[in-house]
Amino acid sequence: MRNRAYTISPSLIPNEMKRNGLKPIEANQTRLTADERALVTAAKKARLRAHAHQSQFKVGAAARYGNEIVLGCNVESDSYGLTNCAERTAVFSAHASGIARKGLRMIAVIADSPEPVSPCGACRQVLFEQGGPDLRVIMCNTRGDVRVATLAELLPGGFRLETTPPRRAAAVAKPRKATKRGPADAP
C-alpha cells in the first residue's frame, strides 16, 4: 500500500475557519484600531529580544494591562521542555512588576510564520485564567497577516479551578496543617 499525501484545497479553508468560529486572515492591519496596531508594533519589538537558539523561531508578544503594555518573548532552554513562550513571559512579567492587578485587556503575538501565529495550548490556558473568555487575541506574522479571535474561540470550555465541584475546590484551597512530625509539607 502506498502512502498518500493529502492536501486541503485553499478554497476549503475559509469554510473550515467559519465552522470553527475563526475570523478570516486580514491581508493588512487596516481593520485594527490604533491601540491594537500599537500593540502589534510593541510585539514586533519584543520579538527582536527572543532567545531562540534551538528552533530559530522567534516570537514576540505585547499584553495590554490598563494603559500599560508589557512585552514578552520566547526564551528557549537547552532542556527544551523548560522553554517559555512569549505570551506567558508577558503575563509573568506583568505579575512580577505589579502591573497585572490592572487586568489583562488584550494581547498581540507575532512570529515569522506562513500564517499568523497562534498561542499554544499552555499559553491559551494561562491567558484564559488571566484575561477570561472575552480576551482579544491578535495573532500576526511578519508579512502583515492578522487574525483576531477571542480566547473563547481559541479555547472553548477553558478550565478554571472555580468551575470544579465545590468539594474538590475546597479541598484544593484548604492548606494542610502542621503535625508533630514537622511542617505541613513534610513527608
Residue positions per predicted region:
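Intrinsic-disorder-associated, low-complexity terminal segments enriched in Asp/Asn/His/Tyr and depleted
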Residues: 3-6
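Short beta-strand scaffold segments in enzyme catalytic cores
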Residues: 54-65
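Glycine/charged-rich beta-loop-alpha catalytic/anionic-binding loops adjacent to active sites
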Residues: 66-77, 103-106
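C-terminal binding/interaction regions
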Residues: 8-49, 102-187
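Short, well-ordered amphipathic alpha-helical segments that serve as non-catalytic structural scaffolds
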Residues: 42-45, 86-94
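Phosphate/pyrophosphate-binding loops at sites that engage ATP/ADP/AMP, CoA/4′-phosphopantetheine
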Residues: 96-101
